[in-house]
Amino acid sequence: RQRQMCIRDSHSAVRAQGSSRVFIGKVSDESADSRGHGQWHGCGVSKPSMGTVVWNCNWGQDACFESHATQPRATLFDNCRGGLVRYHAGGADTEAPNHLSDLTLWNLEVTGTIDEKGINFASDFKWWDAGNVWWKIYPPIVVGTHGQAVTFSQEEGQLTYEESTGVKVTPESLYEAQLQNRLGYVPAWLKALK
C-alpha cells in the first residue's frame, strides 16, 4: 500500500542518522516552495551513519542528496534523481566533513545545478573544497551521472573513480545487481517497490 505525504516547504526529506545498514527507497519529494522547488536536502545520511543505500529516490532540482556531516560513510545513492547543488548536502562547518570515504553515486540523474542565489555548479564540480569550510566530501565513486550536463573537477584528490559521466550505465541499479549476485535473485519486496 502506497502512502503519499504532501508538505508545503520544509528543510529535509528522509535520512539515516547515526545508523548502520539502512535502506531508504522509492521516496519522492513532491513538496514545493514559492519557486516550485522541494526540500533543501534530499534523502540521505547524517551523523556517523554507515552502509546506507538510498535507492530510486527523487528530490528537488535546487537541492542535493543529504550528507549532513558528522562523518557518515559508505553510502550508495543508487538510480536517484535530483539536483546536485553544493552546500545543500548540509552540515555545520564544525562537523565537517560532510561525508567520509566510500560515497558512491550510481546512475544519478541530475535535474538541476543552480542554487537559490543563481550560482551554477554544473562545471568543474568539486567534492572537497579546500577553500571552504562548508563543503568537504571525501573523493567519491561517481558512475553514470546523466541528465543535466555536469563536469567534475579533475584536480588530484577530487574523485576516487569516475566513469560514464553523461551516460546512464547498466546495470541500472547497483544495489539490485549486488543482491542478484549475492543471493541469486532480487527479493520480492524490492521488486514490489518498482
Predicted regions and their residues:
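Short, small-residue-biased leader/transition segments that mark boundaries at the very start
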Residues: 2-7
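Long, low-hydrophobicity, solvent-exposed regions enriched in small/turn-prone and acidic residues
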Residues: 152, 156-194
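Glycine- and acidic/polar-rich repeat regions and solenoidal domains
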Residues: 8-169
